[in-house]
Amino acid sequence: MTRPLLSPEWVARLKQFKKLIVGFSGGLDSTVLLHVLASTPPLYNQLLAVHINHGISGNSLNWQRHCEQLCLDLGIAFIAKAIEFDRSANVEEAARNARYDFFSSLLEDNDCLVLGHHLDDQAETVLLQLFRGAGVDGLAAMQECSNLGAGQLARPFLTCPRVELEHYARIHELKWIEDESNQDTKYSRNYLRHRVMPLLLEKWPGVAGNISRAATHCQQAKANLEVLAIKDCPDLLNATDHLLIEPLKGLEFERITNVLKFWLKKNRVQLPSSKTFQRIIHEIIFAKLDAMPTVSWNQIQVRRFQQHLYLLKADQINLPKAIKWQQFPASLTYPDANIELSAVKAQKGLMIPKDAQIEIRFRKGGEEIYWHDQTKHLKKLFQEWQIPPWLRERVPLVYINDQLACVVGYAVSDLFFTTNPLEAWSIVNNS
């Protein structure tokens, strides 16, 4: 008697979610996953199948129709999404990132994305990471459960060999898509699957399970390193885009690197090379107190100001010259630069004259604001407020009829200040 693909423990775990979003490519893995979930009564009403159309193959539309028909047959809600991504470099990675970005956008609180990755996929992932010279994080490969967006990601088949999925599909007479690109060995994973793994399995039949078990050991090591990082630098618990430097100076370099990795992962930043970590330690952490060095990689910057490290992403570097706030008081968003401002009623604050022209600008130099009965240079105020120099350019400035009326989060010009709660607004920077 074969074991069920979905254990009672997994059923209980998945049952707690409000919605189960199934990544449904139409291939063997996701077809079996969807059928298993649809055949589990406690989970059926939570299911939503999502098919990502990458538009790479000429068969893409036929595959989408196949997936839609199967969902219709099973009575499961279905969404198809065509995605755009950069095809000039690593197509596999770009497609994967675009796919996960869309999945993440669908997830709300207490939702779960369920994917059909199995034990053979895990073994391949470990080997690919090994060949790239990955550390513990990379060799930990895929986790059964992890956070994604506002929800969770689950891989209930991660301990199941592909042959068990094939057996299930045959018994239930399931039809699935065979993507012709899966045979193309120019892709690293396909080369590993078709050329390398057969040789390893010939010599060691249980090698996929052994490799997968190594990933589990690395996941435990990764968790232990995260505990150590927090012990070494308690500021990590509350750190966002800045991190206190002083606790790091008494640590060995390897432990400083461990803290930095935890901090960058917390900010969803791709980790740099070992050489870059060495540069951050030598050139920034142990720099002179008055120095303001920068280390960059992949449109990411780490900088220093006084006693903190600061992390800047690409969307924090490239800012527009001005944004008209035409729908005030509705929130203002500018995704390309990660800008989101909202206006809330206040007891005292910014007064917006009737028919005023409201515009958001950013510091270029020479700005002045009439504040506390004086005309003050913005540069001087930023120094008094101890705002890091590179962050000063990101502070939104509210201009009303071409006059600087508000430095968001810091000051409102006397010319536009009111204590009348019927007229007062507070501008909140949600970026």
UniProtKB/Swiss-Prot annotation:
It is an enzyme of class 6 (ligase). GO terms for biological process: tRNA modification. ATP binds at S25, G26, G27, L28, D29, S30. Transmembrane segments: none annotated. It comes from the Bacteria. GO terms for molecular function: ATP binding; tRNA(Ile)-lysidine synthase activity. InterPro entries: Lysidine-tRNA-synth_C, Rossmann-like_a/b/a_fold, TilS/TtcA_N, tRNA_Ile_lys_synt, tRNA_Ile_lys_synt_N, tRNA_Ile_lys_synt_subst-bd. SMART domains: TilS_C. It is found in: Cytoplasm. Its EC number is 6.3.4.19. Keywords: ATP-binding, Cytoplasm, Ligase, Nucleotide-binding, tRNA processing. One of its GO terms (cellular component) is cytoplasm. PANTHER family: TRNA(ILE)-LYSIDINE SYNTHASE-RELATED. Ligates lysine onto the cytidine present at position 34 of the AUA codon-specific tRNA(Ile) that contains the anticodon CAU, in an ATP-dependent manner. Cytidine is converted to lysidine, thus changing the amino acid specificity of the tRNA from methionine to isoleucine. The N-terminal region contains the highly conserved SGGXDS motif, predicted to be a P-loop motif involved in ATP binding. This is tRNA(Ile)-lysidine synthase. It comes from Legionella pneumophila (strain Lens).
